[in-house]
């Protein structure tokens, strides 16, 4: 998993990784992307922060080191008996809006790629720090704030129950997928050693054909993408890089 870092010197306290007991899921609550949010929090004292931001395309940006205490779920009063900034990691999901931007609006929604990467990141952090699934909670569960809005009202295709089920699945009991799989109206390519789909990256087939996969792991077609050589390449209707 690629994690881009744009760390802020502000808006956090020093800590150690043995403090981590909870993972708190948020939504940004505005229309900015992950990198833009990291830049904002790195630009001065904001009175708030989070460890990670997950973008619309599934890319992940880190603003605060895991060991340090971000200011993401502090409040004067709490609903949760234990979870606080001092013992948690905060993950912010970038969010779209189709109408009203009020906190209580049902017009907020997540992109598929955002949710897929947030699940992957959460599972990675759970495994790394020994955080059980019942310690992955919403900002709403900590303070009562309507955050993350789509996971409080559960009015879209992406629900909190679905998210919890995805992070709770036992990877040892799941049959690892490998190679090309037709899913969700498109194609994914699963790496045999991990059972994870290629995301936000190129893949070369044995015949020398190159493909690009988005943040949800879906093969991209009829679009231009840049490669590591800095050049732009066109992906045909079959997803293959057009070389001539």
Place the predicted regions along the sequence by residue.
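N-terminal catalytic cores of peptidoglycan-degrading enzymes
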Residues: 1-84
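Basic/polar, cationic surfaces and motifs that engage anionic cell-wall
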Residues: 2-5, 12, 16-17, 82, ...
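Structured loop/turn residues at beta-strand edges in well-structured enzyme cores
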Residues: 18-19, 86, 131, 198, ...
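Structural motif
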Residues: 22, 86-88, 210
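Acidic glycine-/aspartate-rich tracts in secreted/extracellular proteins
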Residues: 29-32, 58, 96-98, 131, ...
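Short, polar loop/linker segments at the starts of domains and inter-domain junctions
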Residues: 39, 102-107, 196-199
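Extracellular adhesion/carbohydrate-binding repeat motifs centered on closely spaced tryptophans
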Residues: 172-244
